[in-house]
């Protein structure tokens, strides 16, 4: 029986479901794993991916299903909930199913968006551990990342304070001539802290560091998090952590973590992060959690490692991409799958009637405020105008050769005529379409959805990339802008174009993937523009270089790597029951 999600908070549903949650050793038996492949951590466990992959290397892969969404409202449209609901629906159909979601950042958890654990009866458990650090991967990434900044700033201080002779005699340290105006990396923390976007460090005497402008980003924007999502194994992690560009010297040459001799220590912090954490849904379907990069400012994917394990362990493996199809799906398609070599079968387009009404010209949706009545009452005119956004994303998925399935993530305010209108346009655009009530009913409410996905998986995928790596950077950006965003073209600031030309002329960057940095709230660079706008140009103001991840990141519009905390954050409603020690108020 599903829980009454209209009367119970998510954390209350999680508490009830946790009473019968399998232990790590029960999971070992249920999943047919060997004892040495389970790494217990309290009531959770990690999976030793090398041991599992070595044992299952000859087993055929299962069906590979990606979950994305239409351009969302600021509230999000329920991709995590839909991913969990699909696992539960497939489980109700008796198939061997599992999946992988990203680890949530503490910033959104304590801010507006919540935990990304799903919701209602389509929920990952245990919710407290999921929301409050899980098995420590983000903390390990923060330590490794900030250690690189410690190495850099200490080196700058010592090079200023000591002569060449003293440096050689004391430490055998060669002078790197670091340019304090060209420090790329910055510091990170796992909260939305707008006060730390621009800071001055090193204030004090000569022993108090090197005084310069610096910055903080949110932990999930770190290149190290992106690296975790794409690495193949521990040697690959070690190699990439030694190649990160931290700064540039006064001649314009990169200063790397290898130059600072810190890559090995960074790997020591992250050695355990390469193993995914095993959790489950409220209906006890297995789901891994691994990596957590945002999609608008990073790659937005759970890990290749977890997908490789899942495709060996399960007949159907579900993975989620961040934000909408123009952001997360595009990176799944052209970045993640290029690195992994895996061939996906189906892409689920999570769709809500409220978001389509917004794209049709509905009133502004503001987190924390009541929804205007246009969203809670039938309005076929707004809906029909906004459906173009869904159709645009269906067409994007079809360009990849994958089979699209539109999931109408049901709300109790949706009417039969509204649902029928969405279904008609989705099917006319070449997608299968299913209504799903997984939030209210769990797997039982997702049977139509599960059946549509099973049917789509029977159709052979014609997967292909949008562009070849041989294509020049500016041409790749133009291709993504035109084919995925619907832009007429691309404009470059003089500095950004000069940087792009430099990168195009250096063969070292020929095999770097292109990872766009853009708002998730619009197909354009302007978050206020909704629907499917025409006659616009994508402005590129910079190109970031992630030399460890091997990403070139063109930045469209103004994007901050450190979000801000709102005036009504979630942490105001989170507390601990001091009699039981249990956390309450998470959502």
UniProtKB/Swiss-Prot annotation:
Tell me, which GO biological process terms does this entry list?
tetrahydrofolate interconversion
- Give the E.C. number(s): 6.3.4.3
Involved pathway(s) = One-carbon metabolism; tetrahydrofolate interconversion
Q: Which reaction does it catalyse?
A: (6S)-5,6,7,8-tetrahydrofolate + formate + ATP = (6R)-10-formyltetrahydrofolate + ADP + phosphate
Write down the superkingdom of origin.
Bacteria
* Residue numbers binding ATP: 73-80
Keywords, A to Z, come to: ATP-binding, Ligase, Nucleotide-binding, One-carbon metabolism
Q: Which CDD domains match?
A: FTHFS
- Top-rank EC class of the record's enzyme: ligase
List the molecular function annotations (GO) for this entry.
ATP binding; formate-tetrahydrofolate ligase activity
Q: Which InterPro entries match?
A: Formate_THF_ligase, P-loop_NTPase
Q: Indicate the family of this protein.
A: Belongs to the formate--tetrahydrofolate ligase family.
**Protein's UniProt name:** Formate--tetrahydrofolate ligase
The organism is: Syntrophobacter fumaroxidans (strain DSM 10017 / MPOB)
Identify the taxonomic lineage of the organism of origin: Bacteria, Pseudomonadati, Thermodesulfobacteriota, Syntrophobacteria, Syntrophobacterales
């Amino acid at each position: 029986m599903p829980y009454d999600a209209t009367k119970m908070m998510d954390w209350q549903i999680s508490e009830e479901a946790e009473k019968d949650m399998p232990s790590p050793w029960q999971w070992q038996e249920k999943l047919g794993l060997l004892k040495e492949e389970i790494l217990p951590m309290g009531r959770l466990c990690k999976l030793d991916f090398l041991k599992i992959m070595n044992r299952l290397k000859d087993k055929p892969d299962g069906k590979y299903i990606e979950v994305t969404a239409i351009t969302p409202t600021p509230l999000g449209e329920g991709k995590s909930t839909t991913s969990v609901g699909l696992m539960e629906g497939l489980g109700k159909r008796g198939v061997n199913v599992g999946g992988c979601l990203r680890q949530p950042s503490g910033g959104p958890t304590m801010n507006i968006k919540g935990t990304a654990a799903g919701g209602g009866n389509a929920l990952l458990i245990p919710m407290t551990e999921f929301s409050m650090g899980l098995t420590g991967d983000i903390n390990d990434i923060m330590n490794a990342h900030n250690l690189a900044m410690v190495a850099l700033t200490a080196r700058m201080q010592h090079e200023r304070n000591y002569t060449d002779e003293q440096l050689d005699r004391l430490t055998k340290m060669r002078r790197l001539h670091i340019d304090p105006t060209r420090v790329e990396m910055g510091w990170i923390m796992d909260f939305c802290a707008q006060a730390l976007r621009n800071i001055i460090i090193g204030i004090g005497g000569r022993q108090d560091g090197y005084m310069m402008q610096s910055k903080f980003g949110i932990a999930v924007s770190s290149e190290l998090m992106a690296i975790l999502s794409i690495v193949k194994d521990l040697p690959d992690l070690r190699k990439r952590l030694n190649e990160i560009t931290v700064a540039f010297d006064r001649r314009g040459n990169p200063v790397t973590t290898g130059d600072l001799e810190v890559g090995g220590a960074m790997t020591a912090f992250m050695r355990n992060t390469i193993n995914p954490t095993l959790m489950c849904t409220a209906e006890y379907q297995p789901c891994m959690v691994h990596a957590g990069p945002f999609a608008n400012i990073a790659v937005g994917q759970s890990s290749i490692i977890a997908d490789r394990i899942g495709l060996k362990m399960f007949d159907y493996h579900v993975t989620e991409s961040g934000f909408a199809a123009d952001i997360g799906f595009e990176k799944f398609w052209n970045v993640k799958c290029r690195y992994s070599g895996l061939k996906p079968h189906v892409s689920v387009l999570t769709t809500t009637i409220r978001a389509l009404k917004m794209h049709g010209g509905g009133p502004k949706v503001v987190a924390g405020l009541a929804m205007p009545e246009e969203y809670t009452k039938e309005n076929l005119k707004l809906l029909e105008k906004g459906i173009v956004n869904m159709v645009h994303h269906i067409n994007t998925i079809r360009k990849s050769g994958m089979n699209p399935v539109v999931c109408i993530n049901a709300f109790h305010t949706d009417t039969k005529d509204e649902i029928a209108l969405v279904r008609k346009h989705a099917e006319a655009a070449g997608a299968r379409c299913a209504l799903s009530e997984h939030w209210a009913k769990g797997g039982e409410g997702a049977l139509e959805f599960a059946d549509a996905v099973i049917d789509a998986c029977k159709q052979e995928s014609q997967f292909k990339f949008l562009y070849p790596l041989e294509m020049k950077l500016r041409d790749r950006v133009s291709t993504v802008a035109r084919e995925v965003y619907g832009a007429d073209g691309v404009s470059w600031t003089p500095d950004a174009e000069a940087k792009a030309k430099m990168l195009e002329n250096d063969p070292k960057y020929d095999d770097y993937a292109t990872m766009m940095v853009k708002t998730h709230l619009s197909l354009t660079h302007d978050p206020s523009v909704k629907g499917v706008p025409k006659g616009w140009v994508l402005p590129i103001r910079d190109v970031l270089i992630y030399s460890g991840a091997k990403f070139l990141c063109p930045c469209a519009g103004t994007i901050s790597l450190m979000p801000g905390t709102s005036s009504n954050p979630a942490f105001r409603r989170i507390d601990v029951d001091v009699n039981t020690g249990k956390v309450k108020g998470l959502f």
